[in-house]
Amino acid sequence: LAAGALVLLLGLSGCSRAPEVSVPPRAADAACVAAAKAWPAAVAGQGVIATSTDSPAVRAWGSPAVIARCGLEPLAPTTDPCVVVDGVDWVLRTLSDGASATTYGRDPAIEVLIPKAYAPEPLLLPAFGAAAAALPSTGHHCS
C-alpha cells in the first residue's frame, strides 16, 4: 500500500497536469461501480479534476489533488489508527506529504489520499461516506 500511495502522490507534486493515478485491481467490481456513483461533487470546496485514467473508480478533487480509488483488497487487521466517521471505519496512515485513509471492513476497499494542505485529514472523510457505505461490509470494525 505504501509503495502504491507513493506512486500516486508523486503525480501530485507541483504541476498542473492531471495526477497520475493507478487503477486498483478490482476497480471494475460491481460494488465499485455503485460506489463511484456516490463520489462527492466537491471535497473541501474543491471541484472534480481530471486524472490520468478515465476509470469511474478513480476520482480527484482540487489542487493539490485529493485522490480516491475504489477497488483495493480489504485491509487485514492492523495496529494503524482506525477511526469511525459517519458509520464508516477508516484506517489512517501518515505519508510524507499527507495521509491515506482506507476503508476497513469493506470489500473491496476505498483509499483516499489527502495532501497535508487539507490537514487535519480525517475532516475530509465525511465527503466519502456515501461511496464507502455503498461497499459490502465484511463485518470487521475498528476496535
Where are these regions (language model features)?
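Extracytosolic low-complexity repeat regions of secreted or lipid-anchored proteins
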Residues: 79-143
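C-terminal motif of bacterial Sec signal peptides marking the signal peptidase cleavage site
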Residues: 10-14
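Mature extracytoplasmic domains of secretory-pathway proteins
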Residues: 45, 50, 55-102
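Bacterial N-terminal signal peptides that target proteins for export
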Residues: 1-5
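Bacterial signal peptide processing site
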Residues: 15-19
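Post-signal peptide N-terminal segment of mature Sec-exported envelope proteins
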Residues: 23-46
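Secreted/processed peptides and extracellular or luminal domains of membrane proteins
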Residues: 21, 38-39, 76, 88
